[in-house]
């Protein structure tokens, strides 16, 4: 066989194989490679979105944490203020109660002083009558001289 004919036959077979490969084998391979490249690109994009979402979530979590701490501090402050107001109210109530008890005790003491004075006046009047009776050596009628005794009580 002739070398030229062999070479031409091999060229023809090569071109047929190349044409067959380009028509039937090459498109599915290119589609598979394109799909794989697209999946890789989508995966990288999803990873980037995940990173940005994570950063946003961390910022939001930090903001929520700061907000919660601020709210906690505000509640503690409000509780302390309320505690102080309750203490002040209790002190005020106790002072009012002490003043009321003191006023009642003072009124009771004044009433007892008045009763003791009246009793003392009666005793002084009785002693004065007895003293006058002994001085005069005669009996003095207390009912007759009631006005005089009342006048003496008033002077005492």
UniProtKB/Swiss-Prot annotation:
Keywords: ATP synthesis, Cell inner membrane, Cell membrane, CF(0), Hydrogen ion transport, Ion transport, Membrane, Transmembrane, Transmembrane helix, Transport. Belongs to the ATPase B chain family. F(1)F(0) ATP synthase produces ATP from ADP in the presence of a proton or sodium gradient. F-type ATPases consist of two structural domains, F(1) containing the extramembraneous catalytic core and F(0) containing the membrane proton channel, linked together by a central stalk and a peripheral stalk. During catalysis, ATP synthesis in the catalytic domain of F(1) is coupled via a rotary mechanism of the central stalk subunits to proton translocation. Component of the F(0) channel, it forms part of the peripheral stalk, linking F(1) to F(0). GO terms for cellular component: plasma membrane; proton-transporting ATP synthase complex. It is found in: Cell inner membrane. F-type ATPases have 2 components, F(1) - the catalytic core - and F(0) - the membrane proton channel. F(1) has five subunits: alpha(3), beta(3), gamma(1), delta(1), epsilon(1). F(0) has three main subunits: a(1), b(2) and c(10-14). The alpha and beta chains form an alternating ring which encloses part of the gamma chain. F(1) is attached to F(0) by a central stalk formed by the gamma and epsilon chains, while a peripheral stalk is formed by the delta and b chains. Signal peptide: none annotated. Pfam families: ATP-synt_B (PF00430). One of its GO terms (molecular function) is proton-transporting ATP synthase activity, rotational mechanism. This is ATP synthase subunit b. It comes from the Bacteria. The chain crosses the membrane at residues 7-27. It is a single-pass membrane protein. Its main location: membrane.
């Amino acid at each position: 066989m002739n070398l030229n004919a062999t070479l031409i036959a091999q060229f023809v077979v090569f071109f047929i194989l190349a044409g067959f490969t380009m028509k039937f084998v090459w498109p599915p391979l290119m589609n598979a490679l394109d799909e794989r490249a697209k999946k890789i690109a989508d995966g990288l994009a999803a990873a980037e979105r995940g990173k940005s979402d994570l950063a946003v979530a961390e910022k939001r979590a930090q903001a929520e944490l700061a907000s919660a701490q601020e709210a906690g501090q505000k509640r503690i402050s409000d509780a302390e203020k309320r505690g102080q107001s309750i203490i002040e109210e209790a002190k005020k109530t106790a002072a009012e109660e002490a003043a009321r008890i003191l006023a009642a005790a003072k009124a009771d003491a004044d009433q007892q002083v008045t009763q003791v004075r009246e009793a003392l006046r009666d005793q002084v009047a009785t002693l004065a009558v007895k003293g006058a009776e002994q001085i005069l050596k005669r009996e003095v009628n207390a009912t007759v001289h009631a006005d005089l005794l009342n006048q003496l009580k008033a002077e005492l």
